[in-house]
């Protein structure tokens, strides 16, 4: 049986599980690891099939969450970025007793645009799936470029993301395709109405993948959660605005 790559870092008295986004791996947290490690015990994870967690095929969201849960501490703050936000949210929904607080970063409970719901057009996600089989490397690079578009440090941030991808083995096309399928089909809007632990949602004002318009909609749908929009950030606020990002987590921790 395969196991996922999992590293513990830091010495804080509060556990924080960090889950990366599509196509990436746990190295994406490198820029904030030192800062957070002095306040939290960090759990850095490569999701199944990504980075050093090779040997897994495509998974459903439920399967991916179950695999991550096997290694996780009994109690932790769960933070998920983008696709990782769906995994963290699914964990909060299925194992609420193990989730001290939920943090989603540039994530949506429903990434696909639906009637009355802003998001990515399903045909765009479908197009990415098609392009994966045609030109795998270029498709991943295009997706990474979209994540930093519009920020003052867009080029530099895109290079950072690319170096993270290249630092570890590339995921198989099947795994990447499965991740896009999750983004295209999953809808946790109703499920998360029943989650009642502290719940912080962080957004980038300039995010081209997760529109900030969803923030007020979810404020209404999930009144128990709080949202924060980072003004000059796009889809990777922890890379473009690490100090403000870490401060938001510190504030959350002090409120628990």
Curated annotation (Swiss-Prot):
Keywords: Biotin biosynthesis, Cytoplasm, Hydrolase, Serine esterase
Keyword Cytoplasm in annotation: yes
One Gene Ontology CC term in the entry: cytoplasm
GO molecular function, one term: pimelyl-[acyl-carrier protein] methyl ester esterase activity
Catalytic activity: 6-carboxyhexanoyl-[ACP] methyl ester + H2O = 6-carboxyhexanoyl-[ACP] + methanol + H(+)
EC number(s) given by UniProt: 3.1.1.85
Keyword match Cytoplasm: yes
Gene Ontology BP annotations: biotin biosynthetic process
Residue positions binding substrate: 22, 82-83, 143-147, 235
Subcellular location: Cytoplasm
Domain AB hydrolase-1: 15-242
Subunit: Monomer.
Its biological purpose: The physiological role of BioH is to remove the methyl group introduced by BioC when the pimeloyl moiety is complete. It allows to synthesize pimeloyl-ACP via the fatty acid synthetic pathway through the hydrolysis of the ester bonds of pimeloyl-ACP esters.
Protein name as annotated: Pimeloyl-[acyl-carrier protein] methyl ester esterase
Gene name for this UniProt entry: bioH
